[in-house]
């Protein structure tokens, strides 16, 4: 697995936190076989969020997005596993919940795009940038689960 092992940044947004969906979302990633490397429950500052969403700064919804994301606590996480960025995005569903299939996080728990409960990195490069923005190196925990060999072939 080492050749394709990667990490992704997943954040449960304020609406997901307020609706009590953190456990359900974490459970899905654990059941898939991904390993939690870091987790932080925090009130994100607008400065942090402006950096995080810098690629969207020219979009008309950008100010509202930053305001919404700073309106309550966020659960920021780093997950690791084989093709975790791509698979994580599939698990999340489409950005617009109306386009998300049942069985995806957004398909099961969301109605509107402006309250789509979760963020996931869209590429390995974005994941690396987002992880570095939200976490210090010493906050990333190396821990091989005893279930590792039951999830991955040699």
From Swiss-Prot:
It catalyses: a 2'-deoxyribonucleoside 5'-diphosphate + ATP = a 2'-deoxyribonucleoside 5'-triphosphate + ADP; a ribonucleoside 5'-diphosphate + ATP = a ribonucleoside 5'-triphosphate + ADP. InterPro entries: NDK-like_dom, NDK-like_dom_sf, Nucleoside_diP_kinase, Nucleoside_diP_kinase_AS. PROSITE patterns: NDPK, NDPK_LIKE. Transmembrane segments: none annotated. ATP binds at residues 13, 61, 89, 95, 106, 116. Keywords: ATP-binding, Cytoplasm, Kinase, Magnesium, Metal-binding, Nucleotide metabolism, Nucleotide-binding, Phosphoprotein, Transferase. Its EC number is 2.7.4.6. The active site is at residue 119. Gene3D superfamilies: Nucleoside diphosphate kinase-like domain. GO terms for biological process: CTP biosynthetic process; GTP biosynthetic process; regulation of apoptotic process; UTP biosynthetic process. PANTHER family: NUCLEOSIDE DIPHOSPHATE KINASE. Major role in the synthesis of nucleoside triphosphates other than ATP. The ATP gamma phosphate is transferred to the NDP beta phosphate via a ping-pong mechanism, using a phosphorylated active-site intermediate. This is Nucleoside diphosphate kinase A1. It comes from Xenopus laevis.
